[in-house]
């Protein structure tokens, strides 16, 4: 079963949050939380809180779930409305200040986590190009 967590109108830019998502996607929740605990970015605190909230949601919705089996199925960040402010500039003009917001969505799953596919190593032999026909 899937459990969805949404953090809306977060006062951190979308790109700042998106930098940390590869450390969370596809990981077990305990491993994702420990990954985020070592990161200095403010968005890591918010992501960690969101994952813990997802664990609490999963336990509340189905009482017999083991939190160790939960893993992050998907995690993405969307653009939210921008707060527009004005800063006074020279000669009576104004410069815009754009305070960007974001929405975070995390989906946790207790289904069996798929195995990562192993890439096949290329053979040491290099194929030769076919010779051009003689005229």
From Swiss-Prot:
The keyword Membrane does not apply. Residues 124-135 have a biased composition (Basic and acidic residues). One of its GO terms (cellular component) is cytosolic large ribosomal subunit. GO terms for biological process: translation. Residues 112-135 are annotated as: Disordered. Keywords: Ribonucleoprotein, Ribosomal protein, RNA-binding, rRNA-binding. One of its GO terms (molecular function) is structural constituent of ribosome. InterPro entries: Ribosomal_uL22, Ribosomal_uL22_bac/chlpt-type, Ribosomal_uL22_bac/org-type, Ribosomal_uL22_sf. This protein binds specifically to 23S rRNA; its binding is stimulated by other ribosomal proteins, e.g. L4, L17, and L20. It is important during the early stages of 50S assembly. It makes multiple contacts with different domains of the 23S rRNA in the assembled 50S subunit and ribosome. HAMAP family: Ribosomal_uL22_B. Part of the 50S ribosomal subunit. Belongs to the universal ribosomal protein uL22 family. This is Large ribosomal subunit protein uL22. It comes from Brachyspira hyodysenteriae (strain ATCC 49526 / WA1). The lineage of its organism: Bacteria, Pseudomonadati, Spirochaetota, Spirochaetia, Brachyspirales.
